[in-house]
Amino acid sequence: MSERSVSKSREQKRWYSVLAPEQFDRQELGETLAEEPDQVVGRTITTTLGELTGDSGANNTKLTFKITDVGSDTAYTEFIKYELTRDYLRSLVRRGASKVEASITVLTTDDYRIRVQPVALTTKKADRSQEKAIRRVMIDKVHAAAEDRTFESFVDAIVEGNLSSAIYGDAKLIYPLRRVEIQKLTLEARPSEVAAEEETAVDVDADEVAVDADE
């Protein structure tokens, strides 16, 4: 492609300002370039919690947003992932100590399906039964948090450290802990997607019943 063609193509594109959801005060996340608004929808943008809050101590936390709508020259997003940086996670690990992890899928009260991955770091090496008990606390606390929170309030509980503190409070009674973190949260399905999956499951069950009846 000639330089003139590239220049003309770029001139036909426009910049869209990408905003965080209202939950994050509609802060500007950056800009994205496209010829048409529908080319912007579906794109993702990642920033750090530190950049949104002005707290450099939170730069070890990455937040990912997905563009869902465009109005004029503004692109609106939804939150889809919270994740600690690899460097930060590596810095937490100590030789001669235990690292206890869990991966838990739950539904919030407004039917968002999310996967939550907590991690606990002990002061010294815990035995297998203690690690299992700590993991059980993680699972119970995450389920309890989802049972009385919307997706937005669940995300707030993680960003503000409330969920990790709740896990720490109970798990430290099993074995001394140095740290508990939520290393990752991922949005797996929205309410409409969850409902569609449930309808499909019901249809399959109905078909199986019909086959059994024919037999």
Swiss-Prot record:
It holds the Pfam family Ribosomal_S3Ae. The keyword Ribosomal protein applies. Keywords: Ribonucleoprotein, Ribosomal protein. The keyword DNA-binding does not apply. One of its GO terms (molecular function) is structural constituent of ribosome. One of its GO terms (cellular component) is ribonucleoprotein complex. One of its GO terms (biological process) is translation. Signal peptide: none annotated. Belongs to the eukaryotic ribosomal protein eS1 family. NCBIfam families: PRK04057.1. This is Small ribosomal subunit protein eS1. It comes from Halorubrum lacusprofundi (strain ATCC 49239 / DSM 5036 / JCM 8891 / ACAM 34). The lineage of its organism: Archaea, Methanobacteriati, Methanobacteriota, Stenosarchaea group, Halobacteria.
